[in-house]
Regions:
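C-terminal motif of bacterial Sec signal peptides marking the signal peptidase cleavage site
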Residues: 3-7
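A residue-level marker of the well-folded mature domains of exported/periplasmic proteins
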Residues: 8-356
Length: 356
């Protein structure tokens, strides 16, 4: 979105809300917020940003989301319900970049502006999404790969047999997870091949199909195995992680969001194989934060993780809707992400993004 300017009419129809009060300013604006789920503290952090900004601006917000991020049909219904409320705007974190297209067309037809946050909807009907506020997920996935590779590159260089790197992605439907997963895969493949080794990506077909010049599984020096659980839960993510972590040739594994990273840690409770170096076990890297991940990074169970800025994303989504309704220009915003480990997680630019 290069930049859009419009305005919203005040729609004060007496709806009950649980956001900021409709005090001075804000033109009586009411916004609906549809998140991916409330199952992880990531989304609780994002809602903190929503609520704080709503109170600051004097607008009201109503927040909904399905029980799990794999509950795509439930979220689509919640989005349709939000549209039917005829709000001044909607902030949406879509679980599926395809399943919401019809609803976005309906919102466009009703002239309800939509801001996507956390994840975009690349094929949204033109004009339906006024701005996207999200991490550059491909770049963030690449950061995870770069930091992992520094630890495992000597093992790969000196290996006489095939070695394996695992990646657990919670889905193959949302733009942020797929972008992040491919960012990791492409960067890891690039780094390995630059050092003269061959790579084959195997596992979940969606991710395999995105790989350019994929190698041969039988002869590749390095296998990158990608797994996606049947549903978005820590337990099922743990099962997928265990399947990779029990293979003798596995030297590293990446959980690409809070749920899957916690799945890796849950698997490790039974296996006790995560270590700081591939000589001592399997090198683990996570994504996002939360108390479980923070503790694992602090004690060295994971060598590190990449955190986003969910509070900022929630806040900026409400600000963008407000600005649009006020007739101001709105643009896409790429929010920050940071690599953190036991050494830097207390630093001023890192610590505020490490939510519990």
């Amino acid at each position: 979105v290069a930049g859009l300017v419009a305005g919203c009419g005040s729609k004060d129809d007496g709806k009950a809300t649980d956001g900021g009060d409709s005090g001075e300013g804000g033109g009586g604006y009411h916004f609906e917020v549809v998140v991916k789920s409330f199952q992880s503290t990531y989304w609780q952090a994002a809602i903190t940003g929503v609520d704080t900004k709503a109170e600051e601006l004097g607008v009201t917000v109503n927040k909904t989301g399905p029980n799990a991020e794999s509950d795509i049909a439930d979220q689509v219904q919640q989005l349709n319900n939000a549209i039917n409320q005829n709000p001044d705007g909607i902030a949406l974190a879509a679980n599926s970049q395809d399943a919401v297209l019809e609803a976005l067309q309906t919102a466009l037809d009703k002239e309800i502006p939509v801001v996507c946050f956390d994840t975009g909807v690349p094929n949204a009907p033109e004009g339906s999404v006024i701005a996207t506020i999200a991490t550059d997920n491909e770049a963030a996935g690449a950061v995870a790969a770069e930091n992992m590779y520094e630890v495992i590159k000597d093992t790969i260089a000196n290996a006489t047999d095939q070695v394996r790197i695992g990646e657990v992605n919670q889905d193959a439907t949302s733009a942020n997870i797929s972008g992040r997963g491919m960012g990791f895969i492409n960067k890891m493949k690039e780094l390995i091949e630059a050092d003269g080794k061959t790579v084959a990506v195997v596992g979940n077909q969606y991710y395999v199909d995105q790989v350019e010049n994929n190698g041969d599984e039988a002869s590749a020096d390095v296998i990158i195995e990608v797994a996606v659980p049947a549903q978005t839960t820590v337990e099922l993510s743990s099962t997928e992680a265990s399947n990779i972590m029990t293979k003798e040739d596995t030297i590293a594994i990446f959980g690409s969001n809070q749920v899957t990273a916690e799945g890796v840690l849950t698997a490790n409770q039974n296996l006790s194989v995560l270590a700081a170096t591939p000589e001592d076990g399997i090198v683990g890297v996570g994504f996002d934060a939360g108390a479980t991940l923070k503790a694992a990074v602090a004690d060295g169970t994971l060598i590190g993780a990449v955190t986003q800025a969910p509070v900022d994303q929630g806040s900026l989504a409400i600000q963008a809707l407000y600005d649009y309704c006020e007739g101001k220009e709105v643009k896409d915003i790429a929010t920050d992400s940071y690599w953190y480990d036991a050494e830097n997680m207390e630093e001023d630019d890192i610590a505020p993004n490490l939510y519990d």
